[in-house]
């Protein structure tokens, strides 16, 4: 199986966690795009979706899936999203696609977080993938200096503005042994909107596309 075929297998496997007549939280990225294709096959059986990015919103609307504003929704039974890295404790680095803040908000509302990845995203220790940090533009230099103090090497992601109008610093050379602690430390820096560590709200179910098929892990 190619990497994309493994992503597709994981995306379609997530359909079984979608409840009839529910509103589904939908993430962002290449693996999620396969899930959206799958979700479209049962759009008559769900009420609709809440999206974590403009890109996913456009794709779902094009496929005829109703998209709701999160503020109009009381609860989400499930949120389906990918990850850039995930460890054995279901802690993740997300935000390679710059949608981390909205992803984190939707994940917080959902009762269950189903993470869909191919097997290249599984790691023992988080941090080889640079950690994205969403930052208010005027605070960029200050936040970068604070991230250096935490042992990271922040790089401004040129030409990228988030859906919220902010910028991204990608932090390299972090060996993240305590993801929850680092998530709090970075979020405490003035000017940080949030960072791509999903440790305080990790995944509940992990679906991994492998050459042998989809493997399921639960927290």
Curated annotation (Swiss-Prot):
Top-level class of the enzyme under EC nomenclature: isomerase
Catalytically driven reaction(s): aldehydo-D-ribose 5-phosphate = D-ribulose 5-phosphate
Cellular component per GO, a single term: cytosol
Pfam families: Rib_5-P_isom_A
Keyword Isomerase: yes
Keyword tags: Isomerase
Stored SUPFAM superfamilies: D-ribose-5-phosphate isomerase (RpiA), lid domain, NagB/RpiA/CoA transferase-like
GO biological process: D-ribose metabolic process; pentose-phosphate shunt, non-oxidative branch
GO molecular function, one term: ribose-5-phosphate isomerase activity
EC number: 5.3.1.6
Active site: 103 (proton acceptor)
Residues at which substrate binds: 28-31, 81-84, 94-97, 121
Family: Belongs to the ribose 5-phosphate isomerase family.
Function statement: Catalyzes the reversible conversion of ribose-5-phosphate to ribulose 5-phosphate.
Subunit structure: Homodimer.
NCBIfam families xref list: PRK00702.1, rpiA
HAMAP family recorded: Rib_5P_isom_A
Name of the protein this chain belongs to: Ribose-5-phosphate isomerase A
Lineage start: Bacteria, Pseudomonadati, Pseudomonadota, Gammaproteobacteria, Alteromonadales
